[in-house]
């Protein structure tokens, strides 16, 4: 920033024209604003003049070229006629070049071919607007098809989502099946028919084993209790003895 100059805001858009200052809200309301400027009907683009009142495609007569087709609306028939005329003129030119290359008819046939090709090109350009409309129509049809496919996909996703939600609601509202009975090997049992309230039970096999062992099991239990008995805090030996005692009882 230069010294003595403050920050200046530069707009990326050009300033409005000077006559815009004459169109204030007050002048527009009281009718004192001048009439708007007339639109340009003639302009130049790359040195070529254009007039808005003229046709989009100027006729050949304006360019000083003979118009060989009569009805431009029946363009297929006229294009076939011009094509045949071009072929005949070309054969005539070849024959002249073979027999008499310096004959004056050679220049005439070349001019005829030039005129025929200009007419064919001009007739094609006459249907550029028709081609543009058809291109827009085809583009819109494709866009409609794409939108229809997208709508179908959305409907399918919505239907699948509703099915999933309905299934979940049915599972919540429906009555849950009764829990299965636990096996005897798990050593658990149900309390009041509730699955999450389990109580450990002593298996019947352990009871039978204890009854069969009899006095031997009682002696072993008494010996372990004697080793683990001590006044005061238990030592490491007695803690190990108690652990062995618990393990033996579980077996």
From Swiss-Prot:
Residues 1-38 are annotated as: Disordered. InterPro entries: Med7/Med21-like, Mediatior_Med7, Mediatior_Med7_sf. GO terms for cellular component: core mediator complex; mediator complex. Disulfide bonds: none annotated. One of its GO terms (molecular function) is transcription coregulator activity. Belongs to the Mediator complex subunit 7 family. Component of the Mediator complex. Interacts with mdt-10 and mdt-21. Interacts with RNA polymerase II. Component of the Mediator complex, a coactivator involved in the regulated transcription of nearly all RNA polymerase II-dependent genes. Mediator functions as a bridge to convey information from gene-specific regulatory proteins to the basal RNA polymerase II transcription machinery. Mediator is recruited to promoters by direct interactions with regulatory proteins and serves as a scaffold for the assembly of a functional preinitiation complex with RNA polymerase II and the general transcription factors. Required for germ cell development and gonadal growth. This is Mediator of RNA polymerase II transcription subunit 7. It comes from Caenorhabditis elegans. The gene is let-49.
